From Swiss-Prot:
GO-annotated molecular function: ferrochelatase activity; metal ion binding
Pfam family, one: Ferrochelatase
UniProt-annotated location(s): Cytoplasm
Entry GO CC: cytoplasm
Known role: Catalyzes the ferrous insertion into protoporphyrin IX.
Protein's name in the database: Ferrochelatase
Residues binding Fe cation, per UniProt: H192, E271
Keywords: Cytoplasm, Heme biosynthesis, Iron, Lyase, Metal-binding, Porphyrin biosynthesis
Length: 317
């Protein structure tokens, strides 16, 4: 057996081709940790109908950003960068919740290398049962079904880690460099939305998001900021305000220069590359903004990778 430690990066994944969009959506809508559609025995059937109905529109969006999600390549780049920082005692692997490489494939790769000690590191900074909770539940299901024994450790949140806050602040400064003078710019944090019912039932996601915003904005005294939520899906009550509603509100109050900061996303994917860069940018143009920019995503930011390395070292004690 190897004396190395495996670091398993947990991420949601994304379709790696246009043909993969429908099965990716099927996996997503079949997950009762993220969405409960009717009784459990009916969800697979209903999920199949929803995936088939939604896939043509989603395929068009992926076509506009290159025909696939970049999230696998970006997450694998994060894994390689993290392995370089951690050094010889570690191997880093990637497990995607809704696409490839799957959790089962990732664990099989770890097993082939003879590694028995695994740190599961969620790449969702803010804990929610719909994101980290779902990924960890899937990991535990696969472990139980496989019968393979690993020494498991978990990192399930890092919303207030100083290096994560540093990394976000660095990207915001990069974004603000596109504006002059600084005093005229407002900052809009855009986090992935959740059904309000999750928060009502005690999910800590919203509190985590707000704390991240508070800690980041301590670095930007005098800059006006706002928080909104993107990527709603379905006819339930979602966290408010939505990002598109906030864009309208700020435009009505004569805001002309806006930096949008993607929050809860640690790498580029459809929510940044299409929803923000195309859809919200077009809306901002129609609303009369003079300058609308997005701060760069964390991706392989050295400060962010250092954050992940510190999380690994801390959980090992």
């Amino acid at each position: 057996m190897s004396d190395k430690t495996a670091v398993l990066l947990l991420q949601m994944g994304g379709p790696d081709s246009l043909d993969a969009v429908e099965p990716f959506l099927l996996n997503l809508f079949s997950d009762r940790d993220i969405i409960r559609i009717g009784p459990a025995f009916l969800q697979p059937f209903i999920a199949r109908l929803i995936a088939k109905r939604r896939s043509p529109g989603v395929e068009r969006k992926y076509e506009e950003i290159g025909g696939k999600s970049p999230i696998r390549e970006l997450t694998e780049s994060q894994a390689r960068a993290l392995e370089d920082v951690l050094g010889d005692g570690y191997r880093c692997f990637v497990a995607m919740r809704y696409w490839k490489p799957s959790t089962m494939e990732a664990l099989a790769a770890i097993r082939r290398e003879g590694i028995s000690r695994v740190i599961a590191l969620s790449l969702y900074p803010h804990y929610s049962r719909a994101t980290t909770g779902s990924s960890v539940n899937e990991l535990k299901r696969v472990l139980s079904q496989s019968g393979v024994q690993f020494q498991m450790m978990y990192v399930d949140r890092f919303f207030d880690h100083p290096l994560y806050i540093d990394a976000l602040a660095e990207k915001i400064r990069e974004g603000l460099d596109d504006f002059h003078p600084l005093a005229e710019v407002q900052v809009l944090f855009s986090a992935h939305s959740l059904p309000q019912s999750f928060i009502d039932e005690g999910d800590p996601y919203l509190d985590h998001i707000r704390e991240t915003v508070r800690l980041v904005m301590e670095r930007f005294e005098g800059v006006t900021h706002h928080l909104a939520f993107q990527s709603r899906a379905g006819p339930v009550k979602w966290l408010e305000p939505s990002t598109d509603e906030m864009l309208e509100h700020l435009a009505a109050h004569q805001v002309k220069n806006l930096l949008i900061v993607p929050l809860s996303f640690v790498s580029d994917h459809i929510e940044t590359l299409h929803e923000i860069d195309i859809e919200y940018a077009q809306e901002a143009h129609k609303l009369g903004y003079s300058r609308f920019r997005r701060s760069p995503s964390l991706n392989t930011s050295p400060t962010f990778i250092s954050c992940l390395a510190d999380l690994v070292r801390r959980v090992e004690g």
